[in-house]
Amino acid sequence: MNQNIEKLLKGCGCLSIGGLAFVILLGIVGTCVGDDEDSEAKDALKAKVDSITQQKDSLMVNEPLEGDPYQELDDLIGLEGVKTEVRSLANFVKLQNQREAKGLKTAKVSYHLVFYGSPGTGKTTVARIVGRIYKDLGVLKKGHTVETDRAGLCGRYVGQTGPKTDSVVAKALDGVLFIDEAYSLVPEGGAGNDYGQEAISTILKRMEDYRDRLVVIVAGYKDEMQRFIDSNPGLQSRFNRYIDFPDYTGAELTDIFKMYMKKNQYTLSKETEAYLKTRFNYAVEHKNRNFGNARYARNVFEKSIQAQANRLANEKDLDKEKLTELTIEDLKDGFASKTNIRP
């Protein structure tokens, strides 16, 4: 391989697992670049690499929905402690607003939050609701949520991370910046030259610059998030409100499954519902730390309705009952995957 191209690929992280695809594509668009290429050719090649690698970045802008965010919060299955914490925060902000209106002193409150919890426990959903509540309270003008992670903030070579993080922050102004698995910005061992540190420094600076226009919510596993917060005094001073998202119980996962059924017009017999509860209880009792919680329930539902479709594929003139009812056999296919569930 051309040595200069090889250096460039290493710099942007393309010579890793799956990097061969990048090399092949670069071969199509840049094989004419030789050992003595000029700076313009190298810049063009680097731009091409950037345009390819940035497609892998994780970033989603979620505009606020219409409706009552407080009712949406109350309608969530489980998460009673989370609801109490969010309501408590909203009550405090409301009271401070009233005190300010009467000319009284107000207590400073940090709107930034740490969400502890396993995957699929509702952290992203609640972050979106919090953004809308903050808009309702006058804390934020828009209340939208920009959702990202390490890949969406960190560059692949020196000098890219700062501008990239700034770009994400700019999209989040007047709303919430939600960073999932934020602990990945500080690898275990705390490599000082890691690009995650640059992203953190940039975010902390922008939190100060835009203190009235930006709310940051960081989320991830409890122990890892505590390590993340403890890694930087700036994080410790800005994040002082923590909300714990517990794993769902078997009964709650059953309710989540039934919620999907109701939304999509499916039914269960009493016998099949009893089987459903038994299987979710088993999954909860044998889960590992990567268990998907609500995502698991959704996946079981999607696989179950696919199994129903396969079962009825050759039948004609189906009545409403057959079109809507899920059987135990359908659910067995839905629960077939044992990923993140111990024997």
Language-model segments: which ranges?
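Pre-Walker A (pre-P-loop) alpha-helix and adjacent loop at the N terminus of AAA/AAA+ ATPase modules
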Residues: P69-Y111
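Walker A/P-loop
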Residues: T106-G143, A170
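Short glycine-rich substrate-engagement loop in P-loop NTPases that contacts/grips substrate
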Residues: K142-A172
